[in-house]
Amino acid sequence: MDILEAAKKGKAKEIEALLAKGADLEATDREGRTPLMLAAQYGRTATVRLLVDKGAKPDARDTHRWNAFMLALLAPSGGVVHTTHDAVLKLLPQPKRFRLAITASWTPEKALFSSCFMRPEEMTQHMRQIHPDGMVIEALRHFAATSGRDLIAIVSADARGDTEISERPTPKDVDAVLTLQVEPGAACVQQVDRLSMLIQATLNRPEDQTPLLEKSFGAGVKTGMRGQSATNPNQHGPLYETWAKSQAGPLYWAVLTALLLG
């Protein structure tokens, strides 16, 4: 068993023996992952502690530019953060808390604004009252506060409605600006409104035109909102709100990953 395999399996005693025989503490696999990265990813707390004590570099990056903390948090074995990974995260240097500004606006999804119950201009007015952009901001704020591990502070949020104009300047003392374009849609199918909501997210450093992240969330009517249907206009708001909440987690982790890589 080599040191990489031992780290992955959490075999601390074998690692001690291998290091005594001159094994490389910073050996890497094909993806550039060191023993510390693998032990962190697989939640091997005792092994992580041993490797850190022996001087393993926690800030080393693999070929995808991920480090041990990112692997333990964002790509743990098993697909979700286990309690073992919490113990691992405490042993590794914590990243700085990122300061994020959000600007959001909404626009009707081009092809899909045909409600069974309202004409397009009525639907536009209805959406102005629902505030889909504000819903997405609120869902993201809530997720950051309750499930985001305090790694992102949302220091400013500007919901601009269906205009691009804002009286409020974006603060300069932030790590990044997240721009959200929310595209609510409705299609009349068999006397019910089939709803959709696409969220286009772009993340930029202040004064930098090259995005750290450009990604869509909640795509398509067929996949989007899992075929959520409204039998009257009063159901639009609650259904859009539920959908915004379901996208907050994927959006938050994508933003955090981009910031940690950036």
Spans of features found by a protein language model:
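A structural "domain/chain start" motif
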Residues: 79-82, 87-150, 159, 254-262
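Short secondary-structure boundary motifs at beta->alpha junctions and helix caps
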Residues: 124-126, 206-261
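Surface-exposed short loop/turn segments
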Residues: 159-214, 222-225
